[in-house]
Amino acid sequence: MEQWSFPPQFDNAYLPPADARYWFPRRETMPPGEREHAILERLKDVTRYAWNHAPFYRRKWEEAGFHPDQLRSLEDFEAKVPVVHKKDLRDAQSRVPPFGDYVCVPDSEIHHIHGTSGTTGRPTAFGIGRADWDAIANAHARIMWSMGIRPGDTVFVAAIFSLYMGSWGAMTGAERLRCKTFPFGAGGCQPRVG
């Protein structure tokens, strides 16, 4: 089953045959030119979606003279789409708390709240919608599949479980793959619940 829709919709019951090398054979083996075309089409979809659903991006892009209809190549994306800086995101969150006006789903659809690691001073929180959470799970499951992990395997997730998204992505990917998950993050050895 190849899933190309936008916004993404995932069949979370889907699993390739256990002996399959690829999660999505067509997508993972396409020739470079075809892959670049597929990436460009997805970038067009994503930028149109952000333009229509996130005032932050529309405003930033209008200020830079960019419109999603101007994307004709991957080079256009690199040359025309302005860079978003951490300060831009923090300013947006100050103007429109708690997540800013760059989130592309309504507040009622936010499924998880995570954040950056805080390397620039303080973590920046962000909301993740259900469809995005499913996309994260499927991306991690696909990566694990390519490493030879299969349903029923035990996956040891040795990472810090905090606001930072990385460990949660690995955990949800292993769960999506129907693995037994063993989350084990940093911290003291004393029980946290009495």
Feature locations, PLM:
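Conserved ATP-dependent adenylate/AMP-binding module captured primarily in the ANL superfamily
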Residues: 137-154, 189-194
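Conserved AMP-binding loop of ANL adenylate-forming enzymes
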Residues: 145-173, 177, 181
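Short acidic, glycine/Ser/Thr-rich loop/turn "cap" segments at secondary-structure junctions
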Residues: 120-128, 152-159
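Positions that flank functional sites
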Residues: 76, 159, 188-190
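Conserved adenylate-forming
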Residues: 2, 45, 52, 64, ...
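Nucleotide 5′-phosphate-binding alpha/beta core
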Residues: 1-115, 121-138, 145-146
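Catalytic micro-motifs at enzyme active sites that drive phosphoryl/nucleotidyl and oxygen chemistry
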Residues: 103, 160, 192
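Short glycine-enriched loops at secondary-structure junctions
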Residues: 110, 133, 160-163, 187
